[in-house]
Amino acid sequence: AVMGISALCLFASQGLSVSAATIKEENIAHNQALAIQSNEVANWPTGPVVSAESAILMDADTGAILYAKNIHQQEYPASTTKILTTLIASERCSMDEIVDFSYDAVHDIDPGSNHIAIDPGEQLTMEECLNAILIRSANEVSFAVAEHISGTTWQDFAPIMNERAKELGCVDSNFVNPNGLPNEDHYTSAYDLAMIGRAFFANEALCKMTMTHMLHILPSERQPDDIMEVNKMELIPGGKYAYPYLVGCKTGYTDVARSTL
């Protein structure tokens, strides 16, 4: 039996703006042919071939690396960025704090990206915000939480992210926003994301949020809508690829990053 909790981080490769089917087939074949460094260690169990460009399996209790494939290669994290954002929020804020939604927080998100349709001037509790980020991957909520913690703009939250990442042992990362929306200066690695994941998985409340099937925010005097959104994570119980040993998870996707886990 394997003791403790393992953190698994996978990054698919970057794609180009041509046929999606061709990209997928070519990338899978290319990535499956990449070296798996842990398989080159003498007397170490051979790990599986995966279609991700980089991947890591780490014991979350000890930090021991059980599987390694290009673990220090810098990659775009997409919405897996949000495990760092929510971790910092849980460390710095109480769950009943009131978060204000500015015009910038609501309107700085990319068209078509995940959101819960909050309007400028409305408010949520920090607990509602973290649920919205981890269940619905809400980008405007990530901006609002970043503004709340920095006390100014969401851009000023980036130094806080980078400082905390270094404290957690990250060596390959630079974060410039709280939600992982595309930016060439925003990157991490499988190793760094696993190191952040060690701290995230130690927080039972955050893990529980990622496993919740439905986001439900009731109307209040702070915001008038009855917000209901489904968790689209397919690894949680009831999902298409439900994994019985899962304790918490966050996925991400952008056209640049491709799929991240």
Annotate each PLM feature.
Residues 1-18:
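Sec-dependent N-terminal signal peptides of Gram-positive bacterial secreted proteins and lipoproteins
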Residues 19-191, 195-204:
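Active-site-adjacent loops and short helices of periplasmic peptidoglycan-processing enzymes
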